[in-house]
């Protein structure tokens, strides 16, 4: 998780990989044919970001989990709407990564499972509310 902080964390969320692929490579696959900083090739894919929040909580680093939460939270990007270009209440499928000229621009609102994963990670790991069959742990 230290490498996530060092290489992948951005003000808009955590990128999938860095640097982006810039040359097609059939041995690696389709990801190398996607524009750098877009979708699977170096973008900030919203869906797995909440997994990093949970991981940081498990490691006892709640402040870092909150930092990552705040970076992806749509509401916290209201002051950057000219860059974001998406609704301030919607998680988007991805946000353009550092290797794209439109870095920070959000795309495909509502086309993601990020809302569910965000709720799961925030309630169970950040808040510590863990339902069991008979009770809350």
What are these regions (language model features)?
Residues 1:
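His/Glu-based metal-binding/catalytic segments typifying zinc-dependent metallopeptidases
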Residues 6-10, 21-25, 34-41, 51-137:
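Non-catalytic C-terminal accessory modules of carbohydrate-active enzymes
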Residues 11-15, 44-49:
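Generic helix N-cap/helix-start motif at coil->alpha-helix transitions
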């Amino acid at each position: 998780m230290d490498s996530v902080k060092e290489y992948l964390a951005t003000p808009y969320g955590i990128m999938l990989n860095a640097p982006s692929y810039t040359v097609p490579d059939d041995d690696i696959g389709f990801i190398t044919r996607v524009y750098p900083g877009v979708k699977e090739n170096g973008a900030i894919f919203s869906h797995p970001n909440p997994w990093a929040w949970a991981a940081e909580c498990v490691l006892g680093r709640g402040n870092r989990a909150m930092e990552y939460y705040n970076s992806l939270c749509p509401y916290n990007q209201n002051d950057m709407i000219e860059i974001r270009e998406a609704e301030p209440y919607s998680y988007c499928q991805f946000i353009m990564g550092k290797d794209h000229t439109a870095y920070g621009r959000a795309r495909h609102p509502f086309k993601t499972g990020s809302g569910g994963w965000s709720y799961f990670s925030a309630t169970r790991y950040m808040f510590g509310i863990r339902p069991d069959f008979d009770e809350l742990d």
